[in-house]
Amino acid sequence: LFKLSQRLEVPLDYFFNEQIEIKSNLSNFKQLSARLLDDRNYDDLEYIYRIEIERSTFLTLEDRTYLEWIKAIIDFYQYDSKCEAISSLENILLKVSSNTLIYLKALNTLSNFYSLVGREQEYEANYSHLIELYQTKNLDHQEFLFGYIRVRYNYAHYLVSKEKYNEAIQEALETIELCKQRQTSYQLAPLLILVGNAGAKFLDREQVKNYYIEARELCKIYNNPLMLMKIENYLKELDTV
C-alpha cells in the first residue's frame, strides 16, 4: 500500500514557475493523508505517518516540511500538545517560501489552531493573508482551488462559532457558487450542511431541509457514510420541530 512510485527529477521549469510541483517521494502518503485529513481520521493519519518516517527515502525540503506539518496536526489533535504544534507551524512558515503549497497548508492549519485556542486576532490576520495569497494563484491548479475552498469553508465555520450566522451563510453560499462554477464537489456537502445549520433559526424550514437533502445526495454519490449519518440526524431533528 505504501510502496512509493518511481523517483523522478525536479523539472527545470520548477525554478521559474511556482505552479509546477516537484515530483515527490511522498506521493502515495500525500494522497492518503489528504483523505484522512478530510475525514478528520487522526488515528489512521498517525499510523501512516509513523510508517512513513521509518522509511529511508530521499526527501526534498518540501516533503520534509510536509511531514513536519502532519506531525503538528497529530500533536495538536492526538496529544493535546497545542503550544508545541503551534510553535512547529510558526517555524515552518519562517523557513519555506510563501509561493509553495506547503506554506499555504501550514498557514491555514496554523490559522485553525489559533481559532481553536482563542487567538482570534491572529486567526483573522492569517485569514486575510491567506486570501491575499490565493488571489495571486491560478485556481485552475487543483491544489490551489481545493486549498482556497478549505480556507473559505473554515472561515464560514469560524463565523458560526462567533454566532455571526448571516455572515457565515453569505461566506458559505459564495463558496458553494465557486464550487459550482469550478465544477467541483470538494467540500460542497459540508458547506451545504453549514448553511442548513446556520440558517436553522431564520431560514424557512423547507429551505433548510433542501440544503440537507442536497448534501445527503452528494454523500450518497461519493460514499461518505459518516457525514451521511450526521445529515440523517439533522433531518430527523428538523422533522420533530
What are the residue ranges of the model-derived segments?
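Residue signature of alpha-solenoid helical repeat architecture, marking inter-repeat boundaries
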Residues: 23, 60-64, 101-103, 142-146, ...
